Amino acid sequence: MNQGHPQPDMYYSPHYSTPQYGYGYSTNGAPTTAVSTPMPAPQNVLPVPSALSNQGAMQQPGYSNSSNNGAFDTTGQHNPPGMKPRVTATLWEDEGSLCFQVEARGICVARREDNHMINGTKLLNVAGMTRGRRDGILKSEKVRHVVKIGPMHLKGVWIPYDRALDFANKEKITELLFPLFVHNIGALLYHPSNSNRTSQVMAAAERRKHEGLGGQRPPAPNALPSIGQHHPMMPGLPTGGYVPQSLANGPQSLASTPQPLANGSQPPMPNGGGMLKRGREEEEDLHRPVSNGHDPMSNMHAMSNGYPQQPPLANVHQPPMQNGGDMLKRGREEDDEVHRSAHNAHDTMNNMPGSMPGMSNAYAQPLPNVHHQPLANGDGGMLKRGRDEDDDHRSSPNGHDSAGNFEAKRRKTITSNDSMVSPGGFYTLHNGYGQPGVMNGMSPYKRRDDEAETPRPGPNVHDHLNNFDLKRHKTMETSVPAPQYDAMNRPHSSIGTSPSYAPAPVYDNLARPASTVAASPSYPSAPVYDTAARPPSAISAPRRQQSFG
């Protein structure tokens, strides 16, 4: 928020060439004499304190205050002699109001434009009042508005205009705060030299105030209108008479261009029509009937790149290319390969133009010399990268069958019997249900193929999951059988002991004396004391002497 960045031309300058002030202000504050240019010094955030200029004005001749002649202005509408008004304006964005600011004694006192309330805290600070007295006076006010956030000169307790004027008169600071209490304070900003600038500032403040209110009030008459009101034909704003250029070349040509004739020439297309040449050759191959009814994918391994070579059409003249050439060709090649398995009457995708919805194995009826109207702008190049993944599910040039071709060949072998062909040219469905749709070009029997590829026990099966157990089982069968222990024919002691050590000897306690069994073999046997032969004092006396000593 702007905290008061006044322009040099928004208020009057305190410097004049002569100390006499021979002009007076009317009620609206318009001066009668032109003033000099503003001072060239750079301005601060707030204008120079007017108290300094007021002190200089007191020393000027002709100035009389209330102490001299009692001519004290209690209304605040007339300027003191030798003093010129200084006022700045700032938009208070938080409150959505314009604030007029007057500085006295280095303190900025603000007044709102909408309700004319004045910051009482700053006003009493100009009077030099202590904080305790100031807060006590402001708390006793019935109508007050406390502001705790925002710029410093806007914080404080805001009081009505009348109460602020009473406080200023009691503290004798009304003239010091001139022109804070002037009724038409906004007119002081309209200096003859900067009236245009002031009008722009006021209009901008009014416009921002309405924007801050969220459009609750009608916009100001001098506010800028919206872009759509003055520029209805701008490119970013589509109107009723605006037609996008992309429709003129793209979808419009699809609706207005007639279908090409069967054996005639096609008209040249304005935008990328020639890029469909090789793409249409692939489109013709989609609808070309298959003579033998066999899968053309069976011959794919003999090709160099996995695509069968088809002769170009001889009876249809293709339009010339202008721009965008090869984009749809490669995209249509992938589209051709996706549908190519459907030409041999083994369509698992059920997407041939002549196939019946409920019969997925129906033979597709050919549509000779009928073309699909392609896109005019030639965005088919986007199809190639999207359908490269579909090529991975068909055939690769190294001769290995993927899941889709393996299943197609297997079904070709099963359904090649003539007894399974109905007179109408359709393969009969044995269970009466159509096969489910295919996603991403994958065969519906892919999961069954994966289950069929599960390794089974055999001589040539690779090691996958179950063969590890199979080899381990064979190893266990060919290994030397473990010896069978006969616990009945062996002594009990030899089973529980280690074979490297001799069995422990069994001692006969009856044949040996008890002293030799308990004594260590490296030391002689301890003598046996006869307590009956010795007096008891001889045995226990040394211990008593040691215990008491």
Curated annotation (Swiss-Prot):
Residues 86-192 form the HTH APSES-type domain. InterPro entries: EFG1/Phd1/StuA (IPR029790), HTH_APSES_sf (IPR036887), KilA/APSES_HTH (IPR018004), Tscrpt_reg_HTH_APSES-type (IPR003163). SUPFAM superfamilies: DNA-binding domain of Mlu1-box binding protein MBP1. The keyword Amino-acid biosynthesis does not apply. One of its GO terms (biological process) is positive regulation of transcription by RNA polymerase II. It is found in: Nucleus. Residues 532-549 have a biased composition (Low complexity). Induction: Expression is regulated by the upstream regulator ada1. Residues 246-266 have a biased composition (Polar residues). Residues 205-227, 246-288, 332-466, 514-549 are annotated as: Disordered. One of its GO terms (cellular component) is nucleus. Pfam families: KilA-N (PF04383). Disruption phenotype: Results in near absence of conidia production. Residues 278-288, 332-346, 385-395 have a biased composition (Basic and acidic residues). Residues 120-141 bind DNA. Keywords: Conidiation, DNA-binding, Nucleus, Phosphoprotein, Sporulation, Transcription, Transcription regulation. One of its GO terms (molecular function) is DNA-binding transcription factor activity. It comes from the Eukaryota. SMART domains: KilA-N (SM01252). Residues 516-545 are annotated as: Nuclear localization domain. PANTHER family: PROTEIN SOK2-RELATED (PTHR47792:SF1). Transcription factor that regulates asexual reproduction. Binds the StuA-response elements (StRE) with the consensus sequence 5'-(A/T)CGCG(T/A)N(A/C)-3' at the promoters of target genes. Belongs to the EFG1/PHD1/stuA family. This is Cell pattern formation-associated protein StuA. It comes from Gibberella moniliformis (strain M3125 / FGSC 7600). The lineage of its organism: Eukaryota, Fungi, Dikarya, Ascomycota, Pezizomycotina. The gene is StuA.
